[in-house]
Amino acid sequence: SNSRYDIVLFGGINYDTESTELLLKSKKFSNLDFVSQSMSEEDSRGGSSWGYLPGTLQEVTNIEHIAIKKKLKVSMFTGNDAMEEQFKFLNGANSPQIIHISTHGFFFEDIEQGDNYDASKNPLNRAGLLFAGANNSWQGGKQVEGLEDGILTAYEATNLSLQNTELIVLSACETGLGEIRGSEGVFGLQRAFKNAGVEYIIMSLWKVPDAETAEFMEQFYKKLFSGKTIPEAFLFAQNTMKKKYPDEPYKWAAFVLVR
């Protein structure tokens, strides 16, 4: 029966949330023990910052509506509420069947060699997802005591326990990119979430336009919540998009299902 699906959605995230606001919201997570990791000074990217993704709010809102229609249990975190703490809270017994994260993802490819770089030689420190307020520490701002930095690294994800989670969808820019390391294959987030115990991962290998991303996800979830398996629903969404955009594979071919 599909009633067992419960789903947690993150999207429409505010990357500029003030630390004071996050600190207030983080109170409810204060007794939880997370593995935390901060950006090192060298990793922070100085001037650049992450922009709001309006398409992601539409995307998760659509999925929420589909889930509610099917009478599934759904939680959605957007804006300032889409905190890294909130994601880490989905650990262990709180781990839902499906987690859908629609946000910026990143991967640092090459590293200038420097003394402090040992930590960053590990590819798990160089891939991640962005949550509320991430711009502060991304731009080298001061870390606030007792607060996550809004940047979930693959290393932090590896330390979560997501055995109850059948599927994680990373609907984001560049999240599929990893570092090819001999026969070990692709590191990065994919590896991290597998280590955390997730069975299936859907991710994109390049940035797909917002409208088509939302469309793909809608096709996928409608089928999934109607009782199809994850691979069946994924194949259906792919074929539907392929028929609709035969000459524009960039609009759908980026999505991959990893088991």
List PLM regions with ranges:
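Catalytic cores of enzymes
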Residues: 1-259
